[in-house]
């Protein structure tokens, strides 16, 4: 970390629907500071660590405004993930009640490709960055930790996933064998009615990733997802970053 070989990236594409619908990263999290400010402070404990923010079309403008208003524009690199159109279950373009087409960001699996297309990945490599810590903007427990980075490097793997002990009622992604390959499997891919209490650890969507893994194209799967929009069923195709573990 001290030699500048580690960067931090956060996924900031979501809206805080339970907190007034503003951009999740800029709402107050703790101690009068936003999620974004806390995540930045966690990274900067170790000096001028490169800090990347992946925004969606829904969060980009407000995030840039927030960074500028808090004099943080020069300590973070910001890039956009792609955007897509929702469909009806029959495959037609889904339109909102206003008649406009309905846009969405197609999941955090956009991260590797969007980072490459932004040019930031190449710039990180040129600066000597070898490892990137990726996490959700609202996961304040996922902070830059020399122990985690050291473990990742000592194991010599391209990707290390951070897990948390399963608590009663937890659902979501978890480590599981698919064939003979241990990987992070998203919750909806488990059998219907699966009891997650059987799984000792759950995924946190936090990864230490070797830059070399992100430099190449990776065939992530597209998943069919149904959402309720304006009281109607809309279809989204999404990709998941945890498939990098497969």
Over which residues does each language-model region extend?
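Fold-independent oxyanion-binding glycine-rich loops
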Residues: 13, 56-57, 81-82, 108, ...
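Residue-level detector of secondary-structure boundary/capping sites
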Residues: 54, 58, 102-106, 115, ...
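A generic structural motif
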Residues: 74-87, 160-166, 230-231
């Amino acid at each position: 970390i001290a030699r500048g070989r580690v960067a931090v990236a956060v996924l900031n594409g979501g809206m805080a629907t339970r907190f007034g619908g503003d951009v999740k990263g800029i709402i107050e999290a703790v101690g009068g500071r936003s999620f974004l400010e806390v995540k930045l402070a966690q990274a900067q404990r170790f000096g001028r660590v490169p800090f990347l923010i992946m925004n969606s079309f829904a969060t980009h403008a407000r995030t840039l405004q927030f960074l500028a208003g808090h004099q943080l524009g020069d300590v973070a690199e910001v890039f956009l993930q792609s955007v897509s159109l929702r469909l009806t279950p029959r495959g037609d373009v889904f339109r909102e009640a206003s008649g406009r087409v309905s846009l969405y960001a197609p999941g955090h699996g956009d991260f590797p490709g969007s980072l490459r297309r932004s040019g930031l990945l190449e710039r990180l490599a040129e600066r000597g960055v070898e490892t990137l810590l990726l996490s959700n903007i609202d996961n304040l427990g996922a902070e830059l930790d020399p122990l985690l980075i050291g473990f990742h490097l000592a194991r010599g793997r391209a990707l290390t996933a951070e897990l948390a002990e399963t608590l009663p009622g937890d659902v979501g992604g978890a480590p599981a064998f698919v064939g003979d390959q241990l990987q992070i499997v998203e919750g909806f891919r488990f059998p219907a009615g699966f009891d997650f209490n059987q799984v000792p650890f759950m995924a946190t969507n936090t990864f230490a990733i070797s830059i070399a893994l992100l430099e190449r194209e990776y065939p992530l799967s597209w998943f069919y997802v149904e959402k309720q929009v304006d009281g109607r069923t809309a279809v989204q195709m999404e990709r998941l970053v945890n498939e990098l573990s497969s």
